[in-house]
Every structure is written in C-alpha cells, then in structure tokens.
Amino acid sequence: MKKLMGLIAIVMLLLSACGSQEGFETVTIDGIQKKVEEGYSVLDVREPSEFEAGHIRAASNKPLSDLQQDNFEGLDTDGKYIVICQSGNRSKQASDLLSEEYYNVVNVSEGMSSWTGEIE
C-alpha cells in the first residue's frame, strides 16, 4: 500500500509539473530590444485608448479582448511577437492564447508601466 501511495504521489507530481509549463519564453522589459533585433515585432495587447495614450515605437495594437474572442485578424502565423501590456498580466494571458494557436511569442513580464524608453 505504501508503494502504491508513493507511486501515486510521484505521478501526481509529474503531472502537475507538466501542466505548469508555458509554451513561450518570458523576458523582462530590458529584453525587448534584443528580441526586436532578432526579428520580433512588438504586439501591445492593451485596449486602443491605452495604446493611443502612449506605446513603444513601431508596436502594433491587438487588444486581449479581441484575442479572447478568437480574433487573430492581422497577425501573421509565421510572425514572431513580443507581447506587452500595462503591467504583465494581460500580456501573459495573450501569450497563453497565442501560443495555443501556434504563434511564436515572447511575453514581457513587466509592462508599459516599467518602460523608460521613447513612446509614441
């Protein structure tokens, strides 16, 4: 019985470890420039009013609310995207959705609230 319980515990541990794996890389705000140099496009998933108030130069806007409705229009399935929002919460959700659809994404763990570079 002890062996069976031990085996069950090991299986549960392995299953929980597998479930926590993300299908994308996460970088800090300082990693954006390197990813842009590697050919990634900046995808800002804030709402349009937030985006218009200030965004990273050359970023495109695709709100998380659109992605949650399976609206991926305008995104290139062969593209590489670095995903940013205001604080890192929405970008993680968007990265989850995009990676499930086989998009090549990198999540920014921080957001525009930590960005010190130029904005448009």
Regions found by a protein language model. Give the residues of each.
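Rhodanese-like catalytic fold shared by cysteine-dependent sulfurtransferases
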Residues: 4-6, 18-29, 35-40, 49-80, ...
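C-terminal motif of bacterial Sec signal peptides marking the signal peptidase cleavage site
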Residues: 13-17
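Structural scaffold elements adjacent to functional motifs in cytosolic proteins
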Residues: 42-44
